[in-house]
Amino acid sequence: MPYSVTTGLVGNQQLALFGLPDTTSRQQPGLIVEAVDNYWGGGEFIYCRANGSIRQNGLVVITPTTASGAWRYDCTEVPNTANLGRMLGVATTVATSGQFIWVQISGITPVNCQASVAADTTFGIAAAGQGGANSAGKQVLNARIIAAGATTVAKASCTGNSGTNRLVIPNADGWFCGVYLSGTGIAAATTVTDIDPSGTVVTLSANMTAAVNGTVTATYNNATVYYNVAHLNRPFAQGAIT
């Protein structure tokens, strides 16, 4: 299910680990809301304008900048640089420059990473827009991995027709856009590209090769991209260490 905003905001852009970015600002960038999801729990999200291409669940830097005589909050993929000392967040969707998205700054979320990181450990910036193993000067502070990128979440009683890309599932708990799927009738390298607001229908990146009537498994990595699950509390990149 999508996150439900709990702070009284009316008419908000869909706030979820799935859905689409928007080319029109629906709120003032910089707005922070609290929201809750039945599976991922509560969290905080800041409304930002993408100032470059951002990958799914990418690690981003949040930067206030002036535009048209007012302050605006922009986000870009975090550079692979030590001692940044900058505010970070996790993008809830893929975006390109000029689009508006929600960025998670507290709560539990998958983070796009270069490698699997063990649960209950710190992590750091490993590449532009990606987390990974911690290293000197690159730690993501106020954040910790709570589930490794080797996590799998299987759903029984899934159904879908051969040649289509719409899969009906019992619920979307533990699934998110970008997660890798496998099972009878699921094409190789298939990912989830969208999840219906009901949480019971997902759109796949490839058509099913045969009718699906059974278990489909989501894996949090494809041996190249790893979605480690992190607990965030307004994270920031490590600053000077000398």
Per-region residue spans from a language model:
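Generic hydrophobic secondary-structure signal
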Residues: 1-2, 54, 60, 90, ...
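Glycine-anchored, exposed beta-strand/edge motif detector
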Residues: 2-153, 219-242
